[in-house]
């Protein structure tokens, strides 16, 4: 093994601070032999077709990480492999999480406009809403750079935010009876994301066992970063790899000799 594994969080497209061009520059600097793409492990599409489709879908935001990877592959050899949970896309379609999340959000907005809204629930809702604007998920107005979102500080912010999302919504379901109808689907969604993180970690370790003396880059939405780092950092000695998660310190670590 003796691989080096980089965890690089992205915003899945250009924001004010995060640029796909900067991700491309990181790939040029790291020169990965293996790139793990956040696509389902059972993806039936040829990887190049998948990347081209993703880049086209995100072209208004610079093509996302797919565009950076495709550009890197123009002049460099690297194997691109999927590592997300099996059946991800079909599960999202089946469960309609995005649609249900939108309905719940609209219900919250309508309820908290009422003068009779529960004051504690209102405070908690505004708290999590404010944190969402500051640490928001792939917000196009986010001013944080690729280095900002790939830092220990951002990892703490995201972990705290996700923990508060769980706790605040648990309180809202209790405080506002009309919200209780959304509790089951919310729980399923949060549990699925936790299962995704565990599956990602397992798949990364499986790939690590298949290669020797390689540099691997794991590309992920930055909301997954902290979970992947926590799940991998304690396994470095056992599984024979070095983990790099802070881009600011990447130049301090020697590169492996490619076989």
Enumerate the predicted regions with their spans:
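Internal alpha/beta domain cores that form substrate/cofactor-binding pockets in large enzymes
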Residues: 1-85, 89, 100
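Generic beta-sheet signal
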Residues: 4-6, 214-220
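A short acidic (Asp/Glu
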Residues: 17-18, 45-50, 92-95, 226-233, ...
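Short, high-confidence coil segments that cap the C-terminus of an alpha-helix
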Residues: 32, 211-214
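Short, flexible loop segments at boundaries between secondary-structure elements
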Residues: 181-182, 186-187, 233, 239-259
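Active-site-adjacent alpha-helix immediately C-terminal to a catalytic or transition-state-stabilizing loop
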Residues: 214, 226-241
């Amino acid at each position: 093994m003796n691989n080096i594994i980089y965890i690089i969080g992205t915003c899945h497209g250009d924001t004010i601070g995060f640029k796909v061009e900067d991700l491309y520059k990181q790939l040029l600097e790291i020169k990965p032999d293996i790139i793990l793409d956040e696509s389902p492990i059972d993806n039936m599409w040829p990887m190049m077709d998948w990347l081209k489709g993703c880049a086209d879908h995100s072209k208004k935001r610079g093509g996302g990480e797919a565009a950076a990877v495709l550009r890197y592959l123009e002049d460099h050899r690297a194997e691109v492999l999927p590592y997300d949970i099996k059946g991800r896309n079909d599960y999202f379609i089946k469960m309609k999480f995005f649609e249900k999340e939108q309905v719940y959000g609209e219900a919250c907005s309508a309820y908290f406009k009422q003068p009779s809204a529960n004051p504690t629930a209102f405070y908690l809702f505004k708290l999590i809403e404010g944190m969402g604007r500051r640490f928001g998920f792939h917000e196009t107005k986010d001013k944080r750079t690729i280095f900002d979102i790939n830092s220990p500080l951002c990892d703490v912010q995201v972990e705290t935010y996700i923990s508060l999302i769980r706790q605040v919504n648990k309180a809202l379901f209790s405080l506002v009876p009309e919200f209780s109808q959304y509790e089951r689907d919310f729980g399923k969604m949060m549990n699925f994301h936790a299962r995704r993180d565990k599956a990602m970690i397992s798949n990364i370790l499986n790939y690590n066992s298949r290669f020797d003396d390689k540099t691997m880059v794991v590309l992920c939405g930055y909301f997954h970063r902290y979970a992947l780092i926590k799940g991998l950092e304690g396994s470095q000695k056992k599984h024979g790899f070095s983990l790099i998660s802070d881009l600011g310190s990447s130049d301090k670590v020697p590169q492996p000799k490619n076989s």
